[in-house]
Amino acid sequence: MSWFNASQLSSFAKQALSQAQKSIDRVLDIQEEEPSAWAEAIPYGEPGISPPVSGGWDTSTWGLNSTSSEPQSPPTASQAITKPVRRTVVDESENFFSAFLSPSDAHTIQKSPVVSKPPSKSQRPEEEVKSSLQESSSPGQSRVSETAEVRDSVCVSGETSAVGTPSPVPEDKHEETAGEESEVKVPTVRLKASENVVNVNTTEDVSTTSTQSLTAETKDMALEPKEQKHEDRQSNTPSPPVSSFSSGTSTTSDIEVLDHESVISESSASSRQETSDAKSSLHLMQTSFQLLSASACPEYSRLDDFQKLNESCCSSDAFERIDSFSVQSLDSRSVSEINSDDELPGKGYALVPIIVSPSTPKTKVVESTEENAEEEEGNETLVAPSEEAELEESGRSATPVNCDQPDILASPTAGSGGHSASGPATEQCEAVENQPKAPPEKEDVCKTVEFLNEKLEKRETQLLSLSKEKALLEEAYDNLKDEMFRVKEESSSISSLKDEFTQRIAEAEKKVQLACKERDAAKKEMKTIKEELATRLNSSQTADLLKEKDEQIQGLMEEGEKLSKQQLHNSNIIKKLRAKDKDNENVIAKLNRKAKELEEELQHLRQVLDGKEEVEKQHRENIKKLNSVVERQEKDLGRLQVDMDELEEKSRSTQAALDSAYRELTDLHKANAAKDSEVQEAALRREMKAKEELSGALEKAQEEARQQQEALVLQVGDLRLALQRAEQAAARKEDYLRHEISELQQRLQEAENRNQELSQSVSSTARPLLRQIENLQATLGSQTSSWETLEKSLSDRLGESQTLLAAAVERERAATEELLANKIQMSSVESQNTLLRQENSRLQAQLESEKNKLRKLEDENSRYQVELENLKDEYVRTLEESRKEKTLLSSQLEMERMKVEQERKKTIFTQEALKEKDHKLFSVCSTPTMSRSSSISGVDAAGLQASFLSQDESHDHSFGPMSTSASGSNLYEAVRMGAGSSIIENLQSQLKLREGEISHLQLEISNLEKTRSIMSEELVKLTNQNDELEEKVKEIPKLRVQLRDLDQRYNTILQMYGEKAEEAEELRLDLEDVKNMYKTQIDELLRQRLS
């Protein structure tokens, strides 16, 4: 709805007033002022006068008014030029006022043909030109743009020729104007055309021969090299002039030229060349706008203020932003190429410069100026504003150009094309004349550029975020795979440990069984030995030995009991290890379940990624649909413009009667101004509220994420600076427009006075004008009603946008609060997680230490078992030796008893025998026999004693136990033989030998007691160690329970952490979406305020 503006009404009324005044002067043949040189044509080819400059907006040509016109014309021209005309009329309508004009007048007005000529520097060969002609002639859209451009070019060239032709004054003035024309250097206006010939006539009455003669004259024209500097500098980019009236769609297309051309040229050339092309195009835009503003007020007293206003309107910041955005579009080449592919295919465009040719030959122009001096005096107030509007329209007609299409050069042949294009050209000129000039449209250009680049940035950020999410999901999938492999390796290691422990347990059980069997056998042997010892006779030595053996047996029994306890403890440890193995199996099962859950989560994430890709496709389709909608709206806008042109043609028939229409229009203008002020105040209030809310939200967000908000603060600062600049520009423009309105009101009052004077002298010829005034009033009423409905709809939309903004602010506040809460929870969960990890690592270290201790205990147990077996073997050997010694001692004891009994018997027998001998000897009286017998008996006794001693010694050394019997017999014989002293000595020696044996046995007993004490000490140490190990083993189940609890807590915390992390990620994504939405809403509000 950018074509709707309240100032249209005032400009339309003022233009209608000027046209009515002109037509009334013409009809009544009133000559109050001297004719000016606005519409007089200079002959082409006159010596000393250079031809007009081709294309562009020539400031010196605009300024010819001051040099060639009469002294009375400049104030009128300045008044006409400075007026902010939105839609002006240039062409003289031949359907109504031709009845009041003479044929010569009509002929002079109608002859203003314009012929295009190719430039002197072409950048494409003729073969490429022909191919591009064939390509560009096919699509219908290119024909629509071509016809629009042809119409614009006709209006521009026709009016420029009308302005640039001075009156036939003396030759010195002609030379001055010619010198001024030759010094003009302007950028060439370039048009899109798919035909080789652009030959346009503004009316249908000109014959074919006159058109061909004009084309023949224009063939000799050539452009100077300096006049094509901008064309050579930027051959592929049109120089779009700043049109104040161009709608939001058209300005969007103008700026899209820069973005799309920058992207396409980057794909074919370097980015540096692309940025230089964009800058040159922006420079052309700025210079063209300055030319337009400077040409619009050549004689205005406040020219410096007006230039400052234009500089503020099209500030360098806006152009630098556009340039930066075009450079940024290189990074997002894929996205912008998609957009350019959506918009550009099927359109064959070409660029042709316009050469402004003189309107008529010299003779015809001289005759027309002589006959129609009065008519041209009325025209001089209208020509300059019409030129201004036509230049605006020609700038507005710049549309996106496909850089891949070659530049098509127009050739000045085929005169029939001029007749075919002359009808649409006149209609387009009329449409262009009514195009308004609105300098604030420059701000719309900047706004649309920012909007488009924000769109591109959003698409780029969406693509980047999706690619990042995809990369994160792939990393998560790889991590899950690694965890699966790790879990499998742990399960395999646990299974190997299980097998190893089962083998160890089986070996320990076998050892325990063997020890139990040996213990039972030892008990049975002890019982048998006790029974045997109980049955036998008791002696002091055997009792001591038995006590010692019993003590040894008791010690060994105690050791066996301790070993059995240790074995029981080991069996308990084995059971606990089996339980631990079961727990490990449960952990493995849990890990497998967790791996399955992670696989399911990975599948879910893949599904989410697929859904996001589908959403991206939907976004692309929506973008294409929006592009098609934009094109459709552009077509609708063109259709509406055609309708407006038709309405304006109808309204031209009522141009003479403006008294009542002017009163109504002034009232409407005041009402619209009041409404505009109210709307601006409401917009300012909304913006203030939005700024306050945004400042609060920014303060909260700065506490959360200062880095993100710093960028937003910088953007808001830039926007505020731009807003201040725009406000300053608007204030300057408002002052300028107020001053201009005051001047226009003065002119209108003068015109009203003049019209009142004329209305009294108007004849019956003005009656049809009154009827047309009534028709104009009716059409004005319908237009006002339609504009009121439009205002209502706009106000409704404004209210809806305010409600949406409030809801969005609330959503952002809630999202920020949720994000804060989630961050606090995440920090607490992370701290708990770190503590649990530390505790888990500590418990794992304790578990490893306990495992090492358990291994050491097992090794010591095996070593002690080996020592116990050795002790058992020694015990068995000692038992066997003690049995043998016992048997020997018992046999010796019996032998000694028998010997003692024999000795008693022998001693008794010997005593009886000695008594009998004594009696016999006393009875026998022969002393010699007695001496002989005594000597013999002494000899025999000595021999017997010696033999007895020798035999006794030999028996002691050889046979041992048998010595007693031999000695006993010898003793008996010696006693019987009468050797008692020798026998006593022999017994003493045997007693000494027995005492030596006893001492030796006592030494052995003491050694055994020492070894027993050492073994008992070792047993005490082992029992203490075993008790300590038992206490540690008792602590193992507690540690296991604690480890299980910690594992459960760790798993639950991990699950909670995963859930919180997912929630935080979702909230982060929601917050990003809300921020993006707020950015878009802020940008929309700023655009509304700028508009």
Curated annotation (Swiss-Prot):
InterPro entries: Growth_transcription_reg (IPR052602), TMF_DNA-bd (IPR022092), TMF_TATA-bd (IPR022091). Residues 42-86, 100-280, 360-443 are annotated as: Disordered. Residues 329-338 are annotated as: Interaction with Elongin BC complex. The modification Phosphoserine is found at residues 73, 78, 112, 136, 213, 324, 326, 329, 334, 340, 357, 411, 540, 923, 926, 931. Residues 57-81 have a biased composition (Polar residues). Residues 217-234 have a biased composition (Basic and acidic residues). It is found in: Cytoplasm; Nucleus; Golgi apparatus membrane. GO terms for cellular component: endoplasmic reticulum; Golgi apparatus; Golgi membrane; nucleus. The Elongin BC complex binding domain is also known as BC-box with the consensus [APST]-L-x(3)-C-x(3)-[AILV]. Potential coactivator of the androgen receptor. May play critical roles in two RAB6-dependent retrograde transport processes: one from endosomes to the Golgi and the other from the Golgi to the ER. Mediates STAT3 degradation. This is TATA element modulatory factor. The gene is Tmf1.
